[in-house]
Amino acid sequence: KKNNSFSGLSLVIGLSLGHGIKHFGQGALTVIGPLLKASLSLSEVSYALIFSSMNVSSGLSNIPAGILSDMYRRKIAWLLAISMFTISFGYLLIGLTKIYILILVGVILIGFGTSFWHAPAFGTLAARYPQKKGFALSMHLTGAQIGNTLGPPIIGGLISGITLGSFIKFSGFGWETVSMLLVVPMILTGVLVLVFFKSAGIESDSNWSFQEYWERTKTLIEDKIILGLIILGAMRASIHTSFQLWLAVYLKEELDYSAWIIGWHIALITAAGIISTPIMGILSDKFGRKPVIQISMSLMAIYLFLFLIFDEGIGLVILIGLLGMFFFSVMPIVTAATMDRVPKGSEGSGTALNFIGMSLIGFMSPVISGIIYAKYNFEGISIFAGVIAVSGILLCTFLPMKKVN
């Protein structure tokens, strides 16, 4: 059938590229963050509140994104463009101000725009490729991982500067200038989405009224297995947010690395996932979601606890790379497991609920992990993230994961 065919992969590839550019900008904040923290002389808790605010905004944006994605399926391109334009305004504001409240407004815009992409994009892919959800969603996340991998070292190089022999000597820009430069690719991507993805959403037979949308959403919320999958996704997001946020600060404040070196370390978190993510998606389509999630989270837990031993040098680098094989890659598998239970036509809402859970259930993790980091340093973060991973393994073990739609 046309919807299940991979002869027409243009939508998957195009949305994956757009997702990659979005994450290129999103990952920039991880490198800019420690410099912003030092520039504004922020405490660990004040710094963590910036990312908590972003998570709350990110979670709340899924509500209108889910509603609009299911009610206006043929306007998907506009929803994706709005996502990119909102992110661009956030980075513009961060680059223009040193006032803490306005910085919060900037990251709130970035968080809102970042998650506003997910419901229309994931929902459209799940509807377009119903028998290959794992692969389609994993390919979309591969685009994100390419952006996450390229973003930090490029942003770090733009800030720190790069010297290669006597031929290339670039002294770098200030982090404020780099923040404003990010406006250009975000706006350009939004415009290109409007031009090239007018067909996104054509697989939908009709648009839902708000009443129909609400009735369908209530059935999703009342499904205990879907709620369990949302919590599982939130636990993974909490691990990712806590670890990546404080790894960057640890590399800057404890190991005294430059922004460029920090960028390369952060890039390792997602580099290996570029290869592992589509493979895991194919395996989950063939053998089921549960074994792929269980194995991935088990290895994540082991690697996280090993940071207690290997906290610098080559050991740290290898561990980050190994963790990167599963850190982000398991997310599309959890999302695909949720999509397996979502009725046709509600893919946008199912995606939105997943990301609302990731953002809102995990929104306290930056603050909690900030308190832990202030008292126990990076060792405390490793234990905190490792315990959440073990809890996720237990939850996954008891959650039924079977296609019902």
Report the location of each language-model feature.
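Helix-loop-helix hairpin linking two adjacent transmembrane segments in secondary transporters
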Residues: 140, 144-198
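Cytoplasmic helix-loop-helix junction between adjacent transmembrane helices
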Residues: 106-144
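Extracytoplasmic gate region of multi-pass secondary transporters
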Residues: 29-30, 224-274
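A late C-terminal transmembrane helix in Major Facilitator Superfamily
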Residues: 148, 344-378
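Juxtamembrane intracellular "pre-TM" segments in multi-pass secondary transporters
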Residues: 1-6, 200-229
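C-terminal transmembrane helical hairpin of 12-TM major facilitator-type secondary transporters
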Residues: 284, 289-337
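Conserved MFS/SLC helix-loop-helix module at the cytosolic interface between two early adjacent transmembrane helices
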Residues: 60-98, 284-290
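Interfacial helix-cap and linker-helix signal at transmembrane-aqueous boundaries
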Residues: 36-37, 68-69, 154-163, 167-168, ...
